[in-house]
Amino acid sequence: MPTIKQLIRNTRQPVRNVTKSPALRGCPQRRGTCTRVYTITPKKPNSALRKVARVRLTSGFEITAYIPGIGHNLQEHSVVLVRGGRVKDLPGVRYHIVRGTLDAVGVKDRQQGRSKYGVKKPK
């Protein structure tokens, strides 16, 4: 506990909150271009080949973004929309690609949770 004299000498500093998605620069989403599309393996208890893309954003950042859903059409030079949101078992992946916008098509034959994967209501 500081004394009054110590508090006069230097005041209490406010706690600075650090953003979890700095590349978005305070925006809800950002547009970017895929520079590389590849798969990586998750952390220890899990096992899979997770689809990710290296994306150069309009803010100038180069980030790794997760491609959600089963199957995708993304390749190099695809223009995508990126939102925040990490993938817990992929270290360094702090962004998601938004399906159903720009060059990323929605997931084929998706019936439930369609809004998260950019799928229109089936007829």
Curated annotation (Swiss-Prot):
NCBIfam families on file: rpsL_bact
Keyword Protease: no
GO MF, any single term: structural constituent of ribosome
Signal sequence segment: none
PANTHER family noted in UniProt: 30S RIBOSOMAL PROTEIN S12 FAMILY MEMBER
Record's subcellular location: Plastid, Chloroplast
InterPro entries with a match to the protein in the record: NA-bd_OB-fold, Ribosomal_uS12, Ribosomal_uS12_bac
Annotated coiled-coil segments of the chain: none
Quaternary data: Part of the 30S ribosomal subunit.
Sequence similarity: Belongs to the universal ribosomal protein uS12 family.
Keyword set, alphabetical order: Chloroplast, Plastid, Ribonucleoprotein, Ribosomal protein, RNA-binding, rRNA-binding
Species name: Platanus occidentalis
Function recorded in the entry: With S4 and S5 plays an important role in translational accuracy. Located at the interface of the 30S and 50S subunits.
Name listed for the protein in its UniProt record: Small ribosomal subunit protein uS12cz/uS12cy
Gene3D superfamilies noted in UniProt: Nucleic acid-binding proteins
Chief place where the protein resides: plastid
GO term, biological process aspect, one: translation
Recorded GO CC terms: chloroplast; small ribosomal subunit
